[in-house]
């Protein structure tokens, strides 16, 4: 697990764009990365950012296809990507069995909105269908598992955020993996590596709605509800110190750091949900 102290220099994500202007994460770039990864040419994260690794992979693809090596994704380069270059997002309804650029773009947009569907692979299978249904329910759309015009329009809106501030769940937090792209999938929370037995504190007052073992890799988990569908989640604990149904205040100890569930080492996995959508906790935590 990558770790970085929050008292160190500010975290900066820098990338060299393929165009003269720096760009934020883009679902189309993520789809390109998925296609390059499928061809064995791109080993970086599927992060939707045009950086040096993406540019290098494009040139490798062009050289392999014996077309002009200019780093520009034009029609010939798209054809060289094969099935993963077909179908722009919005050109057709997406459902189980579909494959292509648009499916990979859809996966990335779903993840950005808090509904990841496993590895980014551009193949519409059961996990993408389930994520589409969860998003449709969240967005008050018809729940049919098909990503048509209304679903894509809703995904074009900004991702949700938590509407109130949070406190740090550890007294001396060190940042590990952040919310967002990690390798070929999406990390839905923030990891805080810490020694086993380190106290974990409620980031906001609320009612405990889960306190126990949870399958799916969570291990010992505490979930606290905060009102209108907002929840904070504290996973991989070694001990739980609260009970379901109890109202707790901000700063109350909920348990101890551990490595229960699917964890490579002792750390707190801290997750925030808004009506089921995973949102970036760092946007609500205090600046250091």
What are these model-derived regions, one by one?
Residues 75, 79-105, 112, 149, ...:
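Intrinsically disordered, low-complexity Ser/Thr-rich linker and spacer segments
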Residues 123, 129-130, 134-138, 142, ...:
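Polar/charged, compositionally biased leader and regulatory segments
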Residues 187, 202-241, 266-271:
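Zn2+-dependent peptidoglycan hydrolase active-site motif and core
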Residues 221-230, 244-288:
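Conserved, short, structured surface segments that act as functional micro-motifs
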């Amino acid at each position: 697990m990558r770790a970085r102290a929050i008292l160190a220099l500010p975290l900066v994500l820098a990338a060299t764009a393929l165009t003269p202007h720096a760009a934020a994460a883009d679902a189309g770039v993520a789809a390109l990365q998925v296609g390059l990864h499928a061809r064995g040419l791109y080993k970086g994260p599927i992060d939707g950012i045009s950086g040096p690794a993406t540019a290098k992979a494009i040139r490798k693809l062009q050289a392999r296809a014996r077309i002009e090596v200019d780093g520009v994704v034009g029609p010939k380069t798209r054809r060289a990507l094969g099935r993963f270059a077909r179908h722009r997002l919005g050109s057709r309804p997406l459902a189980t069995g579909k494959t292509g650029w648009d499916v990979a773009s859809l996966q990335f947009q779903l993840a950005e909105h808090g509904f990841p569907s496993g590895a980014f692979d551009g193949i519409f299978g059961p996990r993408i269908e389930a994520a589409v249904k969860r998003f449709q329910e969240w967005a008050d759309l018809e729940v049919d598992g098909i990503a048509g015009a209304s679903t894509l329009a809703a995904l074009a809106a900004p991702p949700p955020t938590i509407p109130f501030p949070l406190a740090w769940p550890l007294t001396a937090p060190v940042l590990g993996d952040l919310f967002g792209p990690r390798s070929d999938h999406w990390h839905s929370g923030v990891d805080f590596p810490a020694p086993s037995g380190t106290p974990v504190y409620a980031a906001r007052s609320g009612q405990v709605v889960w306190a126990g073992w949870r399958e799916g890799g969570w291990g010992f988990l505490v979930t606290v509800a905060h009102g209108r569908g907002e929840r904070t989640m504290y996973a991989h604990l070694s001990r739980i110190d609260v009970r379901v149904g109890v109202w707790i205040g901000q700063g109350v100890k909920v348990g101890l750091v551990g490595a229960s569930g699917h964890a490579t080492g002792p750390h707190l996995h801290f997750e925030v949900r808004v009506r089921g959508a995973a949102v970036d906790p760092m946007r609500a935590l205090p600046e250091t």
